[in-house]
Amino acid sequence: VPHISFSELKKWDFCPFYHKLVYKDKIKGFEGNTHTAFGKAVHKVCESIIINEVKEPKAVFHEEFVKEISYLKEDCVDWNLVDQMKTQGSELVELVLPAVKEEFPNWSEVISVEEQLFESIDEFSTKPYDFKGYIDLVIKTDDGKYHVIDWKTCSWGWDSRRKADPMNVYQLTLYKKYWAKKHSVCAEDVETYFALLKRTAKTNKVEFVRVSNGKKRTQNATDLLMKALYNINAGVKIKKRTSCNRCEFRRTEHCP
């Protein structure tokens, strides 16, 4: 069964032609840099902390960061930034578990870590399609609520515009919808959060941003998903000109 992830949906929304280059033509675009290596390393620590409450998160971070950097092409690595990130990451990962416990004092159970979603998209009738995703963390509190959490590494945080940007919040909207479907849980018992892990912030380095997902937002996210699937299956691949100045393929042989 074919599938679509939120990452793919986001690329399609950015530009259908860009989506075609990446997913149909298999043209490699952005393959990572120092920032993505940092993010992957911090994510790995968060996973280890929640499962095992590791005593030395700094050591786990350092090992994972060095490994992720080694996967990058030499010209993609900013070595001065790497040195800064080693210090910043070591400080940041020590704060994650205390922050989770403070935000959710009645946390009673870890439901899953890095949980895979592969749920059928029932609204799309043209052909079978699954929604694919990986949920960083789901915990349950003693009031019976489930809390879906997505770790996001960043520099100093998000402004109010980014916190409300549909193409950010729809990720959690769809995760909530399909996680609840997978587990036959009432959607009203599921709450969602971005956990911002701030590399350069002086205070509030771990911030939980609650994302509300009412019926209207859920419908809007589902409508966007349906629109993308319809156009992808119909072979529609128009260029979204408003995205050209932010596109890595602009003025290349792939998109002259």
Task: Name each model feature, range by range.
Residues 4, 94, 177-256:
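Metal-dependent nuclease catalytic regions and adjoining charged, substrate-binding loops involved
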Residues 9-54, 86-90, 94, 114-115, ...:
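Nuclease catalytic cores
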Residues 25, 152-155, 196-198:
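A short beta-strand motif that forms part of the nucleic acid-binding face
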Residues 29, 156-160, 203-206:
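Short small-residue beta-strand/loop micro-motif enriched in glycine and branched aliphatics
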Residues 29-37, 164, 236-242:
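Structural motif
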Residues 41-44, 170-178:
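Short amphipathic alpha-helical face segments that pack within enzyme cores
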Residues 44-121:
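A non-catalytic, helix-rich entry segment at domain boundaries
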Residues 112-172, 180, 221-224:
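Non-catalytic protein-protein interaction segments used by genome-maintenance enzymes to assemble
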